[in-house]
């Protein structure tokens, strides 16, 4: 698990129908959230927030993360987004997030992180799958550091949040 308590406004970029954000808000009653995804996706999000009892603390915004993301958050979440894309496309997405984040904010990248060298066969299979299917890839911590640096972020911390998922905390530079 990851501690979202330090943040007052959390934007979940490409957050689907809002399951992650609804759970974050349910566990943190003082927070507000913004769910951001394509119009046809967020159109189905209302019942998720209603069921969690957090509809009054969440805005649902439709848009395109290649163009802009909602501004004013002190945390922007990207869960299992970067592994879908190649580096150049990710830099475009990350620079859009960089323009929107508060100077003291954090970008929270939730992804599987490959072990260096050739460890972890199941993660390597996931990497191959991401390459073949959508054209993306799984990355090592060092590859994430480079990708984020190219997008004007620096990695502040990496927190293991569960099996096969870590939270990469990145700060704007």
Question: PLM ranges: what are they?
Answer:
Residues 3-173:
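Alpha-helical subdomain
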